[in-house]
């Protein structure tokens, strides 16, 4: 699922979804040239952690894809596991994205590509059992 849009500093993207029982889901903010300005990938018992050789467990992987190549991943470990419904918000600040999960600040992510080049927001359940309930843009960023 996706929405086509323009996005800039001071705006937020909200995605509400039922978390997968296993696997991964991602929310991507993509520029018109295919650059992935922001990739946030929730992994619940998925794939392989090269450090441990075991699956990733309850982690957010945050990254960007510039010129066809992924950058260095940033990770948020131990994402809450008792929650079934996730309300995820990412807001464009002056120099970075602020990321919230269920109204709790979980990370900031410095821009690696201009945020005003965004033309699409995508939600991908990667073939697992996550269910998207809402995907929208909020103008302007909600006040806390």
Swiss-Prot record:
Pfam families: Gal-bind_lectin (PF00337)
PROSITE patterns associated with the record: GALECTIN
Record Gene3D superfamilies: 2.60.120.200
Alphabetical keyword list: Lectin
A GO term for molecular function: carbohydrate binding
InterPro entries: ConA-like_dom_sf, Galectin_CRD
Record-annotated Galectin domain positions: 1-138
Function: Lectin that binds beta-galactoside and a wide array of complex carbohydrates.
Protein known as: Galectin b
């Amino acid at each position: 699922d996706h929405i086509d849009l323009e996005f800039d500093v001071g705006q937020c993207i909200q995605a509400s979804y039922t978390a997968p029982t296993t696997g991964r889901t991602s929310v991507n903010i993509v520029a018109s040239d295919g650059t992935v300005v922001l990739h946030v990938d929730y992994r619940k018992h998925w794939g392989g952690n090269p450090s441990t050789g075991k699956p990733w467990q309850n982690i957010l992987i945050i990254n960007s894809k510039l010129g066809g190549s992924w950058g260095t991943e940033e990770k948020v470990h131990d994402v809450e596991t008792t929650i079934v419904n996730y309300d995820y918000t990412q807001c464009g600040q002056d120099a970075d994205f602020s990321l919230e999960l269920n109204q709790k600040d979980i990370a900031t992510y410095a821009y690696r590509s201009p945020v005003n080049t965004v033309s699409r927001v995508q939600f991908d359940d990667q073939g697992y059992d996550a269910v998207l309930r809402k995907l929208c843009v909020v103008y302007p960023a909600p006040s806390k």
